[in-house]
Amino acid sequence: MNQTHRALIVARMAPGSAPDIAGLFAGSDAGELPHLVGVTRRSLFQFGDVYLHLIESDRPPGPAIAKVTEHPEFRDLSERLTAYISPHDPDTWRSPKDAMAHEFYRWENPGAK
């Protein structure tokens, strides 16, 4: 059984921007970028002005994302998202890895498939 890797990206989002953000990712997910990173599932969440982006992939997504930051599709998506998404902590944000939450606990039911 293949291990699923996860990354949770945390940022701020503009009020009312969820449909626009979802549309940008729907367009991007139809291209090659998810395959380059190994994304198998993506979920976007909103909690007030907090943007939560859960990536599930077949390999650790952090290093894979770092490898594609200069890819034209990544740059285009990132540029378009700046209209709606801003760093959670602008003082410490330097690259996408600075927006990734640190997983400190995981439990999985050993009997679940």
For each predicted feature, which ranges?
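A broad, low-specificity signal marking well-ordered, structured residues that form hydrophobic/aromatic
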Residues: 7, 42, 51
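Short, charged/polar surface micro-motifs in flexible loops or helix N-caps
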Residues: 15, 50-51, 57-63
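Hydrophobic pocket/interface hotspot
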Residues: 9, 21, 53
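Short amphipathic alpha-helical segments
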Residues: 13-40
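Short glycine-/aliphatic-rich beta-strand segments at the starts of folded cytosolic domains
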Residues: 2-15
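An amphipathic, aromatic/His-enriched active-site/gating alpha helix that lines ligand/cofactor pockets
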Residues: 31-39, 58-95
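Glycine-rich beta-strand-turn "strand-cap" elements at beta-sheet edges
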Residues: 2, 40-48, 77-113
